[in-house]
Amino acid sequence: MTTAAGLPRLHHGDLVRIRGERWRVSRYVAFDTVAIIDVTGCGPTNRATHARFLLPFDAFDRLTLSSKPRLVSRARWRHVARRTLANALPSWSSLQAARDANLSIIPFQLEPAIAMTKGDGCRFLIADAVGLGKTVEAGLMIAETLRRQPDAKAIIIAPAGLRDQWRDELRHRFNLEAPILDASRVASTAARVGADINPWAVEQLVITSIDYVKRPEIMRSLEGLIWDVVVLDEAHHLTGKSDRAAAAAMLSDRARVLVLLTATPHSGNDAEFSRLCSLGNAGGSEPLVTFRRTRADAGVQFARRAPLIRVRTTSAEAVMHEALMDYARRVWRQSAEPSAAGARLAVSVLMRRACSSAGSLARSIERRLALLGDVPPTDALQPSLPFTASGGDEEPDSVLGSPGFHDLADERRQLARLLQIARTAAADESKVAMLRRFVSRVEEPAIVFTEYRDTLQRLAVAFSHVDAVQLHGGLSQPERAAALRRFTEGNARLLLATDTGSEGLNLHQRCRLVINLELPWTPLRLEQRAGRIDRIGQQRRPHAVHLVAAGTCEEATLAALVFRLRRIQDALGMLAQVPDEERVAESVLGAHPRFDLLGGPPPHVPGVVLLDARAAAQEEALRIRLARSWVRGRGSSSDIERPVIAHLRRRRERSVPQCLWVYGVVLTTSSGRVVWEALLPFRGDIPNVRRHSTKLTRNLLHSCPELLQRAVEGGCDRLVSGLQQSMQPALLRWNARECDLAAALRARHARLSAGLIQRGLFDRRDERLVAAQTSLLREALSRSADRLRDLAQSQDLRVDTSALVFAVVLE
């Protein structure tokens, strides 16, 4: 059989010789004048390797092997049967990549990938608790997509500090190579491939940071690409009104499958939660399939202990906290107007600094006094809480520069007095003393968290006698990697860290103890901190110790908030509403402290669907475990080139001997893309015969009587019909998604170009840029049209091959 272009038609499973080596065809796609074949090596030098060839430019010879079954020993037959069953997929949506992944099979981690392959959605929010393996779940989705579509492309957007961790996890868990694209790598790729090729389109799987992607020139390069999978890690940082959020929205609108990862999806702001849930919903009707598992749901081995240690303040610290509270509440009363939001933000920063350390408070008061010497206009637009999207460990000067009193001279006098009190208290800090005693007693590795970098420097001095390393947002990537290496390899006992420097890290193999020097006013940060050591794989009971200053707002409000937060998250999971900084500040500094800060479930957002795929995941996990046990320590299946038969006798003799035939059926689309490799078993009795010779067994199983032939044809027809019916909802969803992507490409192209290009009278660069963007758009729309055509062809399913794999006579 030949194609329209005169090329020989190849089928799945055909043996060919290309470039002097033997290959088995795994995928054949024909175009007008050429054909692409994906192959797996089955020769002595290329066994189990994968390659792609282009016909007719790569010449090939078809290898014809005998289809006559081979009578084999019981051991050989058992090997072939087990190998065949291990590779079998009970459904077209069964996972293919999970069996070969280097990870323990935990059922709930399979749920998102199962939902993706079944077509339950195109947008996914994985909101599991910290430490439950969201990276593994997203990695499974990527690996599964690349296994099913060898030409698929995926991109992972992660905080800069987590890029190396993502690369190492993908390599270790899934044997996937994912280069980190930054300015240097993009420049070298562009120089290598030429100016006419988009460097972002060269690699199949890439990792980059949101701060790099948000650059205008990078967004221009990415706007003309459609990705099969887009993963947004720490997605709760991408919901505000910022360049980061704009870049995330643009990429989300170009994702066939969008995966949002965050342990803290609802940070207390309903509007930001709604924006998170609307990412990638360009058409307005695409559901957000959500998964949320608490530690109890996941069956974590050890329950975390989180004791509060009440620290008695010194007399100087008590005076400092009392004076600061008086000042802060006075500012709070005098700045009730929205135009004075900056003053409230400033005093909330001072309160948080005081809970961290007296020295940290003194430094901020010094800066505030200096800034109040040059007061900006009172009607200037001021930021509201929280003042950053990423939780930096140093606040900008603009935060501390808003006056809080109507009488500025009076405020400066109050601040000068506070500064002297704070300097006195800094000479003997109770929390630092308590921390030193605690660390000396536990005698094991620990992570000490604080919100502020200057407090971190104070701790470094206090623990100069201990092997300690620092991790904060001001470190370069090599410095950060060196610090982590010292700690994880056991060369440092203490890791002194801020939230910005440590987000997303896996440190559970090194220690089980986290110590919080202060309680952050964003309560979800406590969960993020504990998640560094409280993760799947932790072999001991994790501890998260909170130091609380007695007689301060930490004890009065924040400690109670932390206790209630833990209880409500145990009940409602990570989607529970929690307060943001603004609500916490109102509770601490308002005239009537509020203790109703914690709400119930998150607000209803249209289109958010909580999917329960536990039953399917349990079945899939059992199948994968069995498949692993059947192929462990055995050779490759690529040497199974002929069907095998055997004659087996049972211990208990049966009254009627039986024959079992197992056929392999390959179902493809009209274009030749393999959709499902299924097995069809048939059984028949052998009446009037008690014992069989070898020759009789071979003849009986090799022959294909008319009755068996009709059964095979009927089974194939049922497979095609059932597959078409089960795939129809998924095809409709994928088709609608592709149409939305094409519409978003057209709509955003003109808007983005207009915002980034300023035409010059004598400079033609803008015109060249528009031409380049138009070319990218045309190419992206062409690929989208190809995708729609492939989806249409997927509705026309057919049997590519059906052949006997193994058979047996049982008596």
Task: Outline where the language-model segments fall.
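Conserved SF2 helicase motif VI
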Residues: 522-540, 544
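A short beta-strand element within the Helicase C-terminal
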Residues: 226, 272-275, 506-518, 543-546
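SF2 helicase/translocase NTPase motor core
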Residues: 50-82, 88-114, 121-122, 132-139, ...
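Basic/aromatic-rich interaction segments and small domains that mediate binding to polyanionic partners
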Residues: 20-56
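C-terminal accessory region of SF2 helicases/translocases
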Residues: 72-80, 540-683, 687-692, 731, ...
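Conserved Helicase C-terminal RecA-like lobe
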Residues: 304-313, 363-493, 801-811
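SF2 helicase motor core recognition
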Residues: 215-216, 268-269, 456-457, 481, ...
